[in-house]
Amino acid sequence: MGLLSVLTLVLTVPIWRRTPITGTGLSFAGLGQAGGLRLLALALLNSLPVAITSTLFLFFVEDRLQLPDKAGPLLILFFLSAGASVPLWAKLSNRIGPKQTLLIAMPLSIAGFIGAASLSAGNLAGFAVICLASGAALGADMVVLPAMFSVVLTRAGLNASAAFGIWSFARKLGLALAAFFTLPLLERSGFTPGQTNSAQALTTLNLAYAVLPCILKVGAFGMVLTLPTEVTRK
């Protein structure tokens, strides 16, 4: 995650050089009226798939795909794809709008989850392609959703610093929820990392890593579909 943070910082320097808008005091009522709470709910739901896969990535690669010592290179590939895609998604968002950009990016992630669920053990090339696609999709989440939230705050004249503190909390909550629900689920199935596991345990891992995030991502995609286009444009 540190590598991804550095890449994001470097690639989004022009965005953070803009003059900050402090706005007026922040309240949940004000956020709700501006549409900010809706975007916060979307951010939380949309953070869950990547939070789950981040939590279970090592288990999936080494135990489900049986690719020991390949998790590190695959994770780097995922991060590089995410970081490299950020400026491309930013340009596309400026051209066609944030909502339409997300509607293009999210199916990439959904396709990646479907592909991961159907991979056979030892399929390194197939999972590498999935890491590239899902990393690129994450790049859109990193740049487009915060930009949409910023537009809402600016139009409503709300305090950006306080609001983005709540935004950051929502994403961290997603990570906590991912670990809270998936790790006990694997434990109950009898899954043990680095050991010979039963078919049931590996199926549970497959469902937790690929199928559940896919369902959550489809839900987030549905939420994006309901967003008014005019609200998401600068």
Show where each model-derived region lies:
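Intracellular loop-helix junctions on the cytosolic face of multi-pass helical membrane proteins
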Residues: 1-58, 62-67, 205-234
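Loop-to-transmembrane helix entry
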Residues: 57, 63-81, 126, 200-208
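Loop-to-transmembrane helix entry/capping segments in MFS-fold secondary transporters
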Residues: 68-69, 155-170
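Residue-level signature of mid-helix packing/kink "hotspots" within the transmembrane helices
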Residues: 79-87, 176
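Helix-to-loop junctions at the C-terminal end of transmembrane segments
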Residues: 84-98
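Cytoplasmic membrane-interface "Motif A"-like loop-to-helix N-cap segments
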Residues: 94-108, 156-157
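C-terminal ends and interior cores of transmembrane alpha-helices
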Residues: 107-122
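Hydrophobic core of transmembrane alpha-helices in multi-pass small-molecule transporters
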Residues: 125-142, 148
